[in-house]
Amino acid sequence: MMENVFDYEDIQLIPAKCIVNSRSECDTTVTLGKHKFKLPVVPANMQTIIDERIATYLAENNYFYIMHRFQPEKRISFIRDMQSRGLIASISVGVKEDEYEFVQQLAAEHLTPEYITIDIAHGHSNAVINMIQHIKKHLPESFVIAGNVGTPEAVRELENAGADATKVGIGPGKVCITKIKTGFGTGGWQLAALRWCAKAASKPIIADGGIRTHGDVAKSIRFGATMVMIGSLFAGHEESPGETIEKDGKLYKEYFGSASEFQKGEKKNVEGKKMFVEHKGSLEDTLIEMEQDLQSSISYAGGTKLDSIRTVDYVVVKNSIFNGDKVY
């Protein structure tokens, strides 16, 4: 049994002496594989979070992105389209038989996406290990992200199989109900799980799920994440895919989980739900605010770069830091 687990709202980072005159001097960039990105943040590869338009916007502006895999037949034209514009192609694959053929087809057509994310709910499995090896054999130049996992053993095994990064988080997401439906996962202790996994990792880790505030991005970095995947905070923007509805004079957008009946079109093995989030304005504004908040985090950490956050002290506050006033 794990002792002393904690989640984002149980932790406060402790400030160190500031060395900048303005937070604008702080550098939030991060390198993943061969490319450098403006923020250590990636919108979730979910149908109500990202589409081709948003992927293009993110890539053009030096943000990392991962396209979802829910219209698999569009992936080849997507890769061609992105690369023809001089942008990175970053796609998702599953582990079913036709995905093996898809990888071979990419190799045959000499299409190498810069990033491939093997994306299944329970990533600590032979199915994922086999797919990592298959991709590495046919597309050795692609950077492979494998997940999702929640234990150090899983991180080690996927790294040993050839994964270039692992994605950590089982069910902590806002529209994920894995914890309720199965009793398993990292919901409620995602930050501790991240720390536990990061200690075992020799390659980058992507924290996935449970982020509710911008401060949680800094906390993820403190506990070992290179990149932080975010769903709900990116949902509900003008550009976001999904229906807009009006209720009591307020605008909302739908946001649903990746194994929800809304996404699957059926009610079998449902582990996701749908919710309506308040309409948030433009994605660009949110990304700019995230960058500014992270610059402030870096200045509180007493540094000029993201890495300075990794060494700050922290406290575990057993009463939630939000004193009952939920900020999200």
Curated annotation (Swiss-Prot):
Statement: the UniProt record of this protein carries the keyword Electron transport: no
Keyword flag Amino-acid biosynthesis: no
Highest taxon of the lineage: Bacteria
Any single Gene Ontology cellular-component annotation: cytosol
Active site annotation, chain numbering: C176
Cited Gene3D superfamilies: Aldolase class I
Protein residues bound to NADP(+): 205-228
UniProt keyword annotations, A-Z: NADP, Oxidoreductase
Transmembrane regions listed in the UniProt entry: none
Enzyme class, first EC level, given as a word: oxidoreductase
Catalytic reaction equation(s): IMP + NH4(+) + NADP(+) = GMP + NADPH + 2 H(+)
SS bond partners: none
PROSITE patterns linked: IMP_DH_GMP_RED (PS00487)
Gene Ontology biological-process entries: 'de novo' pyrimidine nucleobase biosynthetic process; purine nucleotide metabolic process
Function: Catalyzes the irreversible NADPH-dependent deamination of GMP to IMP. It functions in the conversion of nucleobase, nucleoside and nucleotide derivatives of G to A nucleotides, and in maintaining the intracellular balance of A and G nucleotides.
Annotated family: Belongs to the IMPDH/GMPR family. GuaC type 2 subfamily.
HAMAP family on file: GMP_reduct_type2 (MF_01511)
PANTHER family found in the cross-reference section: GMP REDUCTASE
Record-given protein name: GMP reductase
Protein species of origin: Bacillus thuringiensis (strain Al Hakam)
